[in-house]
């Protein structure tokens, strides 16, 4: 039994690192170079903002009843296509060529998801907590938020064997059939997707604008990424992660 538990967590250590790198880089859809220091794995950014996991019933957390695209100020410009994958980047040590600038809301979501997964599963890598699945709502919001953003083909999701790139850039909507397909394809060999109404899963939540002024300013800094053109009076959605545990 102990050996089985050790093998499970060893497998999670091996699988989670490249998957988080893939999430944060949006495959070959990142718009600027990234540092490669975090966890000592190529592709993981050294300067990533920490996502928040909030306990169920948190007064500032509420699961979305529907799945709107997460909006961020200045997010009206669609991604601009540029040359996609080349043969030279079909190597783990190579930098990924841009597929076009990601939309601000998708870039923001992926940064938060990367931080939340890192914080949530770091203790689980050492066997301190059981591995919990993803809520289907998280998958749906992920898919809806990034549906129009460019991404490389599914071959980039392979954790072993030969990897290749599609000859042209594709969007999330063209690559994945739906939200469940997205989560299964990207994280399925590490995290399963919980059944609807599951009592234990990782979910997303959005609180009303202005309810949490300090986190709001923090999120503004993340989205602005040094642009210096913040609009402090503009309403902004609050995005966070929530660990759901229902009775």
UniProtKB/Swiss-Prot annotation:
<feature type="signal peptide">
    <location>
        <begin position="1"/>
        <end position="31"/>
    </location>
</feature>
<feature type="disulfide bond">
    <location>
        <begin position="152"/>
        <end position="165"/>
    </location>
</feature>
<dbReference type="GO" id="GO:0009897">
    <property type="term" value="C:external side of plasma membrane"/>
</dbReference>
<keyword id="KW-1003">Cell membrane</keyword>
<keyword id="KW-0272">Extracellular matrix</keyword>
<keyword id="KW-0964">Secreted</keyword>
<dbReference type="InterPro" id="IPR004269">
    <property type="entry name" value="Folate_rcpt"/>
</dbReference>
<comment type="function">
    <text>Riboflavin-binding protein which might have a role in retinal flavin transport.</text>
</comment>
<keyword id="KW-1015">Disulfide bond</keyword>
<keyword id="KW-0472">Membrane</keyword>
<dbReference type="Pfam" id="PF03024">
    <property type="entry name" value="Folate_rec"/>
</dbReference>
<dbReference type="InterPro" id="IPR018143">
    <property type="entry name" value="Folate_rcpt-like"/>
</dbReference>
<keyword id="KW-0732">Signal</keyword>
<comment type="similarity">
    <text>Belongs to the folate receptor family.</text>
</comment>
<dbReference type="GO" id="GO:1902444">
    <property type="term" value="F:riboflavin binding"/>
</dbReference>
<feature type="disulfide bond">
    <location>
        <begin position="106"/>
        <end position="146"/>
    </location>
</feature>
<feature type="disulfide bond">
    <location>
        <begin position="139"/>
        <end position="183"/>
    </location>
</feature>
<dbReference type="GO" id="GO:0033165">
    <property type="term" value="C:interphotoreceptor matrix"/>
</dbReference>
<feature type="disulfide bond">
    <location>
        <begin position="99"/>
        <end position="169"/>
    </location>
</feature>
<dbReference type="GO" id="GO:0005576">
    <property type="term" value="C:extracellular region"/>
</dbReference>
<protein>
    <recommendedName>
        <fullName>Retbindin</fullName>
    </recommendedName>
</protein>
